[in-house]
């Protein structure tokens, strides 16, 4: 079966094994097939939450995002990470190969 829909009491479930699965709703929850772990929860006009191994790690807020745990940022070929201070000033943060850290106004 490529696509299944079933209802279990208070909730409706969908299982897709081929192609895109496009879902619309005011609250969308994605979880393991056996519901043992959550992946993503989306709530209209509210937070989007992303989970890792059952623990909330990334959440959108009205002012930005909240990251729980470590955040690893790779810069690729760019020249650092740009951070904005509370007063709106932007700073470029660069970590050199030898581990030295430098900042400069953008």
Enumerate the language-model features and the residues they cover:
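Self-maturation zones of extracellular/virion spikes and adhesins
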Residues: 1-56, 64-106
């Amino acid at each position: 079966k490529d696509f299944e829909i079933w209802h279990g009491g208070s909730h409706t479930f969908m299982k897709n094994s081929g192609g895109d699965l496009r879902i619309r709703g005011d609250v969308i929850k994605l979880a393991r097939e056996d519901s043992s772990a959550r992946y993503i929860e989306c709530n209209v006009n509210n937070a989007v939450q992303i989970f890792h191994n059952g623990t909330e790690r990334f959440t959108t807020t009205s002012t930005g995002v909240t990251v729980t745990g470590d955040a690893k940022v790779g810069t690729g070929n760019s020249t650092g990470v740009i951070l904005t201070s509370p007063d709106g000033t932007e700073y470029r943060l660069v970590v050199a190969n030898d581990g030295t850290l430098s900042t400069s106004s953008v």
